[in-house]
Amino acid sequence: MAAHILVVDDDVALAEMIGIVLESEGFTVTAVEDGTRALDEFHTDAPDLVLLDLMLPGIDGIEVCRRLRRESDVPIVMLTARSDTADVVAGLEAGADDYVPKPFKPRELVARVKARLRGRDESAEEHLRLGELSIDVAGHVVRRGGETIALTPLEFDLLVALCRAPWKVFTREELLEKVWGYRHAADTRLVNVHVQRLRSKIERDPERPEIVITVRGVGYRAGTGS
């Protein structure tokens, strides 16, 4: 079944262009023009991915993102003006997985969407341990003792990438390629914000992390978790 993409943008011409591009790649697309309709459509049709403009009439994109993330781990990709540095960070902190700066090339947009929708190999069983954490890779489940820790798919992929290579120090650029599937030109905010989000869920004290360790001037590595 074709993946269903919800496009939320008040620029009707742009939304129409995005729809044409994605449908040519085999996706089904629904487009809405404001935040209220986006939330309604999400609850009605349960899309597989949301393309979300930050500047919307009424409920803005950041608030829409925040509300969606409270109830779902659906991939969210922001559409934003290239100069909106503060908005990009705010959107990522609200729960977005990725962003595409405007203007963008159609193939770039398609690559972002496919990266976030990439399939997982459910047949290969793999279990990882890091300190108190037990990670069921095929089941996408993280536990500490009897407690299940809820992570978004992207947060889970980030944790697994680090845990599969314990003590290896990953640069932010390596993580962008390994986890997101591509490199952003001189932009590591995606990694930094998602590391913060991941730490807030898996660390006993996010201010003194023991699972995801910062190596200053280089990047991140898995710690002992103890």
Ranges and model annotations:
Residues 123-127, 150, 193-195, 199-226:
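DNA-binding patch around the recognition helix
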Residues 16-24:
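Charged docking surfaces used in two-component/phosphorelay signaling
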Residues 26-34, 41:
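Short hydrophobic/Thr-rich beta-strand motif most characteristic of the beta2 strand and flanking loop
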Residues 45-51, 56:
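Active-site beta3 strand of CheY-like receiver
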Residues 9, 33, 56:
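Conserved acidic carboxylate
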Residues 33-37, 60-63:
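Acidic catalytic/metal-coordinating carboxylates
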